[in-house]
Design a protein with these regions (language model features):
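Helix-loop-helix connectors at the membrane interface of multi-pass transporters/channels
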Residues: 116-121, 147-167, 199, 257-268, ...
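Helix-loop-helix junctions that connect adjacent transmembrane segments
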Residues: 45-46, 85, 158-162, 194-329
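Membrane-interface loop-to-helix entry segments
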Residues: 164-222, 251, 274-278, 282, ...
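Membrane-helix boundary/coupling elements in multi-pass transport proteins
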Residues: 111, 134-148, 245-263, 326-366, ...
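Extracellular loop-to-transmembrane helix junctions
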Residues: 46-47, 57, 68-166, 481-485
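C-terminal membrane-solvent junction of multi-pass transporters and transport-like membrane proteins
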Residues: 192, 368-378, 417-481, 503, ...
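Membrane-interface "cap" regions at the ends of multi-pass membrane proteins
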Residues: 1-73, 77-82, 96, 100, ...
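TM-loop-TM module centered on a large, flexible mid-protein loop between adjacent transmembrane helices
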Residues: 117, 124, 156, 242, ...
């Protein structure tokens, strides 16, 4: 009988048997997998216990949240219904190319460090270092923001309870979920995401029926698309601003790369999740924006006033109320709470795994690379929780510090997306340069090299367009707050580069080797697929005989 250790795979940044190579990137050496004996005890690692449905819902749930339920109204108000649709469609396409780029690498090299590890191996270790720490910091701060937001949402029902009580309770709950086996995290995230998906589906059904007049009175149809300056208002700057809001709404989809390191069958689950998630997200966002724009004119002040503290004027709430759902505010408040809880849960998972991967790459203290018997990186989880807790305290006792921390993490998601595009471009070129064939890749990104290059250009435009108004009036304080993530990222990159004397890795020296652990996971996935095909064939033959 196989032991628990035998059934698990090492999916850290530096995989089993990997030793640091000159230049800072890892070179994997063959380390046989054997049963534990007195002379050979495998080190504990995170475990591959996430199923395909978990991976799909984690990515889907990570991108359907308050950005859709609350902030979507702002894009319609500022750019008009047409501008909002263009922004979300363009960002959706950009995200699709990023996801296919990440998917190609993640199915070939499924590691917990994801894009940070890939940047270290395919581009420059300094890039991976900066991306990893930036991403960890972003999600640690986001956990603090989400716990604060959740307390505001909960006060809708319990106005007498102090905010800090709810915040600490939510932070403790998130910690408990993440300290259990990764399967518990996956199940929790699956059901939280399912609540959001069902809400959007109900909203679309009720909204479309209202648009054509079956419920809610007279049919508005497309009158709001020709109202005053609609469908486009504010010109190109307004549309570019809508790009920024839409971009923040889609952030979280890159979590699919981190889950690859703990997926039971990454070569099957990652491609399937990418296909499902892209179309669902794009349709959910585009149709939701369309319904809101049809039912609420872009001039409505309610579109600008929606926030977590006043869910009664969320675009979703207004549409439900127009259709005659009296309890709309309470229902949407519950949905927003699940969204915030889901975001905090995903954020804790992502930041913990990134810190663990950085330690495996020897880019963080080694203690953060330790895991318990269940494959949970407890030191990394404790460190992340501590940072989130301190950030939360700063929101109570030092508002300026809290504002600085939030601003410092503001553009990290976009920086990660840009890094994914660069890493994939380098990976594919190195793969072919070193004599490999595309047929060796179990999943290939679409429209290479056009796809990742277009996505990179769009991502840079979105970063630049975050706060054009402040450039117009030369508001240096606002510019500094908005773009603070960029210089901090550059400081991390340059500091590591100069200290370790790293260079851009030549294509013919890029490390494309797969450790025995990765090959074993690939073989197991292939065997499972073959067994499923044989089982299906036997069933068909049996049916034919009958």
């Amino acid at each position: 009988m196989q032991t628990d250790q035998q059934n698990q795979t090492d999916v850290g940044g530096n995989l089993a048997g990997a030793q640091p190579a000159s230049g800072g990137h890892a070179t994997c050496t063959a380390t046989p997998i054997a049963s534990p004996t007195p002379s050979h005890t495998p080190s504990r690692t995170v475990k591959r216990n996430l199923r395909t449905r978990h991976v799909s819902m984690i990515a889907l749930g990570g991108s359907i949240g308050t950005g859709l339920f609350i902030a979507s109204g702002e894009t319609i108000h500022s750019a008009g219904p047409g501008g909002a649709l263009v922004a979300y469609a363009a960002i959706g396409i950009m995200v699709y190319f990023f996801m296919t780029s990440l998917g190609e690498i993640a199915t070939y090299l499924p590691t917990t460090g994801s894009f940070a590890t890939y940047a270290s191996r395919f581009v420059d270790p300094a890039l991976g270092f900066a991306m990893g720490w930036n991403y960890w910091f972003n999600w640690a701060i986001t956990v603090a923001v989400d716990t604060t937001t959740s307390s505001i949402v909960l006060r809708y029902w319990f106005p007498q309870v102090p905010l800090w009580v709810f915040s600490l309770a939510v932070l403790a709950l998130i910690f408990l979920i993440n300290i259990l086996a990764v399967r518990a995290f996956g199940e929790t995230e699956y059901w939280l995401a399912l609540v959001k998906v069902i809400t959007v589906l109900i909203f679309l059904a009720i909204g479309l029926l209202t648009v054509i007049g079956i419920i809610g009175g007279k049919a508005p149809l497309l009158t709001n698309f020709t109202y005053r300056k609609a469908p486009f208002t504010g010109g190109f700057p307004a549309v570019l601003g809508a790009f920024a809001i839409a971009g923040f709404s889609f952030q979280g989809t890159e979590l699919i790369g981190i889950t690859a390191g703990e997926s039971a069958n990454p070569e099957k689950s990652i491609p399937k999740a990418i296909k499902q998630v892209f179309w669902r997200i794009l349709l959910f966002y585009i149709l939701s924006i369309f319904v809101i724009a049809c039912l609420i004119p872009y001039t409505s002040p309610n579109l600008l006033g929606s926030n977590a503290s006043d869910i009664s004027i969320s675009p979703f709430t207004l549409v439900f109320q127009r259709a005659g759902l009296a309890a709309a505010a309470g229902v949407m408040n519950a949905v927003v709470f699940t969204s915030v809880l889901s975001a905090a849960n995903s954020g804790m998972y992502a930041s913990t795994r990134m810190l663990y991967a950085l330690a495996k790459e020897k880019q963080a203290p080694g203690i953060f690379g330790m895991v318990n018997f269940h494959g949970i990186p407890v030191p990394a989880l404790l460190g992340t929780t501590f940072v989130a807790f301190m950030a939360f305290l700063s929101s109570i006792f030092g508002e300026e510090i809290y504002t600085f921390l939030v601003a410092a993490s503001g553009l990290t998601g976009f920086i990660a997306w840009a890094g994914i595009a660069i890493s994939h471009y380098r990976f594919r070129r190195a793969f072919l340069r070193q004599g490999h064939r595309l047929s060796e890749l179990r999943y290939r990104a679409k429209l290479f090299p056009f796809g990742p290059l277009l996505a990179l250009i769009l991502c840079i435009l979105v970063i630049i367009g975050q706060d054009l108004h402040s450039f117009a009036v030369w508001d240096w304080r606002a510019i500094g707050i908005t773009y603070m993530s960029v210089p901090l990222f550059l400081i991390l990159f340059l500091a590591y580069k100069f200290k370790n004397h790293t260079k851009l890795i030549p294509l013919d020296q890029v490390d494309l080797s797969r450790s025995p652990i990765e090959d074993q996971a690939s073989d197991q996935a292939a065997n499972r697929a073959e067994e499923e095909s044989l089982s299906e064939l036997k069933s068909r033959l049996a049916a034919d005989r009958r």
